[in-house]
A protein has these predicted regions:
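Conserved nucleotide-binding/hydrolysis micro-motifs of P-loop NTPases
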Residues: 98-102, 155-159, 189-191, 228-233, ...
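The Walker A/P-loop phosphate-binding site
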Residues: 7-115
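Flexible beta-alpha connector loops of hexameric P-loop NTPases
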Residues: 120-125, 194-204, 238-249
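Phosphate-binding/switch region of NTP-binding enzymes
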Residues: 107, 208-282
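Structural motif
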Residues: 61, 151, 183-187, 224, ...
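Cytosolic-facing regulatory segments adjacent to core modules
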Residues: 41, 48-49, 84-180
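Amphipathic alpha-helical transducer elements in NTP-driven molecular machines
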Residues: 40-43, 102, 130, 134-137, ...
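Helical hairpin unit composed of two closely spaced alpha helices linked by a short loop
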Residues: 167, 180-215, 222
């Protein structure tokens, strides 16, 4: 019986580096001519982390402490991108596995109106103002002409996520048969179910990182992934004012070894006032 070399693995097809250089020149020229604009947001520092805004075929990981409004941040980013980039054609696919759909919608209305969840839900018998409610109704009506966002609320595996992204790209193909650009947001990374053969969340996160990299290389997508933080962020030593430990570090992000090696940009969200830190960082 003939022994198979390298366990019978298929060989990969190398690409000439010269071809890569040519592609680089084409991209530089297109950027110079304004043919591949980035997605601008309302935050200059966020835009500066990329090249004038969120770029296609990138992975952005956002680590945040509980209570810092990470879901609100995600909603704001998506709303900003749609509002500030009207000349760009793209779709949005959200994996919102933490909330039920109506709760997510009410938080969206809160973002649009500036009212908090309790106000919109008439807490303690204080009925929501009629004008405020009508503003929510008007926003709902306006989305009929700008229905760019689809949402997945069901918990799924990483493989199911990839299959869903592919399905959506096929569903909304351009007239010339090409795929549209798609912004994919994930809230949050640890909520994916373990797939077959995955023993724990860390193996799942490793698979997620590999899947995100595969998808960005093969499809016109950009990912923004929310991640929870490890508990060491709450160590009392890190609550001392004017200390380097006040900052969110790469190592604070849950499953950082598995996920961050695939990220193009990493952002930390903090709210020092929660820990009564008056002077933040050295």
């Amino acid at each position: 019986m003939e022994k198979k070399l390298f366990n019978g693995a298929r060989h990969l097809l190398p690409v000439s580096e010269r071809q890569s250089l040519e592609k680089g020149l084409v991209k530089m020229k297109a950027k110079r001519e304004g043919k591949i604009p980035a997605l601008v947001t309302a935050w200059p520092k966020f835009n500066d982390a990329f090249c004038d805004g969120l770029e296609w075929r990138t992975i952005t990981v956002v680590g945040a402490r509980p209570g810092t409004g990470k879901t609100l941040f995600m909603e704001q980013v998506v709303s900003d991108i749609i509002e500030k980039n009207p000349d760009q054609k793209f779709r949005v696919l959200k994996f919102q596995m933490e909330m039920v759909d109506e709760t997510s919608a009410i938080r969206k209305f809160g973002l649009i109106t500036g009212a908090d969840y309790n106000t919109l839900m008439s807490k303690d018998g204080k009925l929501v103002d009629k004008k405020l409610f009508e503003k929510c109704v008007e926003y709902y009506k306006s989305t009929i002409n700008n229905d760019l966002i689809n949402v997945i609320y069901d918990t799924c595996t990483v493989s199911e996520m990839c299959a869903t992204i592919h399905y959506e790209l096929e569903r909304y193909k351009n007239e010339d048969g090409t795929y549209p650009n798609m912004l994919v947001t994930i809230d949050h990374s640890a909520l994916f179910k373990n797939d077959i053969g995955q023993k724990d969340k860390f193996e799942m996160l490793g698979a997620l990182g590999e899947a995100l990299t595969y998808m960005k290389k093969n499809y016109p997508v950009a990912f923004v992934v929310l991640s929870q933080l490890n508990r060491n962020i709450d160590d009392t030593k890190r609550q001392v004012e004017a200390n380097y430990g006040n900052y969110v570090l790469d190592s604070d992000i849950y499953g950082s070894d598995a996920l961050l090696q695939h990220a193009d940009v990493v952002i930390g969200i903090n709210k020092p006032s929660i820990r009564k830190i008056k002077k933040y960082g050295p």
